[in-house]
Amino acid sequence: MAKKITGFIKLQIPAGGANPAPPVGPALGQKGVNIMEFCKQFNAKTQSEAGMIIPVVITVYSDKSFTFVTKTPPAAVLLLKEAKLQKGSGEPNRNKVGTVTMDQVRKIAELKRPDLNSIDLEGATQMVIGTARSMGIVVEG
């Protein structure tokens, strides 16, 4: 018989940087998950992507065991990395803080495609362009 699912936990954690401190510890502790076990598994799986923020969906079962699925980094984080910026604009319609090329946007769209609800690459590209626009990043080309 399959294990009964008791809940899902969605977090965004720096790759290779999961530790029992907030926000990871309290979120997992509420569901009774072994925090250190999750941290070890997550850090081992995401070690190669150090420095990126990785969204993770943790499925908690009735016997307090868990499984987790990592997603691709948020488009905003990837855009900031490509534009070599620390953060986006506070007033994106007035202050432009950086630029990215269309090739960089396509590269991000290809990377994000599995997690986006778009039919084709063009739709995914348009979503990434919209994210860039809302962050005050100009897309050239």
Curated annotation (Swiss-Prot):
Q: What does this protein do, in the record's words?
A: Forms part of the ribosomal stalk which helps the ribosome interact with GTP-bound translation factors.
Write out the similarity annotation. Belongs to the universal ribosomal protein uL11 family.
The protein depicted here goes by the name: Large ribosomal subunit protein uL11
> What is known about its subunit structure?
Part of the ribosomal stalk of the 50S ribosomal subunit. Interacts with L10 and the large rRNA to form the base of the stalk. L10 forms an elongated spine to which L12 dimers bind in a sequential fashion forming a multimeric L10(L12)X complex.
The entry's comment on post-translational modification says: One or more lysine residues are methylated.
Q: Which GO terms describe its cellular component?
A: cytosolic large ribosomal subunit
GO MF annotations in UniProt: large ribosomal subunit rRNA binding; structural constituent of ribosome
Keyword list (alphabetical) reads: Methylation, Ribonucleoprotein, Ribosomal protein, RNA-binding, rRNA-binding
